[in-house]
Design a protein with these regions (language model features):
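Copper-binding active sites and cupredoxin-like electron-transfer domains
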Residues: 1-134
Length: 134
């Protein structure tokens, strides 16, 4: 296992949030190849259609081929999907988030060596260089 404390952060993007922050991960495939990709994010789930209260809860989304995109609406550090309250407009998260590093990647594992992965770092204490959401 690798540790950022020992070897430093990866060269791939490290996105940052505080636990329980409502977070939107926009995933798209801009490739011109016909290969299909599957996005995954460890420790998190989201709604297949984020604005549909009756949709499936998933932890990976496939079918990403040429020019396809989707939004994963998550609560940072939580396995509970982002919800939008009674009004359907206000993003709400439970208070069960856990600070740590969460791997996002293409679940086609042969792409890991080429850098098709990164981290979402979830903090539980205020950081001087990361403003809290309003």
């Amino acid at each position: 296992m690798f540790s950022s404390a020992v070897v430093g952060d990866p060269a791939t993007p490290v996105f940052r949030a505080y636990k329980n922050d409502p977070t939107y991960v926009r995933v798209l495939n801009s490739s011109d190849l016909g290969r299909v990709h599957t996005f995954g994010l460890t420790g998190h789930t989201w709604k297949y259609e984020f604005n549909d209260p009756n949709t499936s809860i998933i932890n990976g989304q496939g079918g990403l081929n040429t020019s396809r995109a989707f939004n994963a609406a998550i609560c940072a550090g939580s396995n509970t999907p982002l919800s939008f309250g009674a009004s359907g407009l206000t993003p709400t998260c439970p208070s069960d988030g856990i600070a740590g590093d969460y791997l996002y990647n293409d679940r086609n594992l042969f792409l890991l060596p080429s850098g098709s992965w990164g981290l979402i770092r979830v903090h539980d204490a205020p950081m001087a260089d990361l403003k809290p959401l309003p």
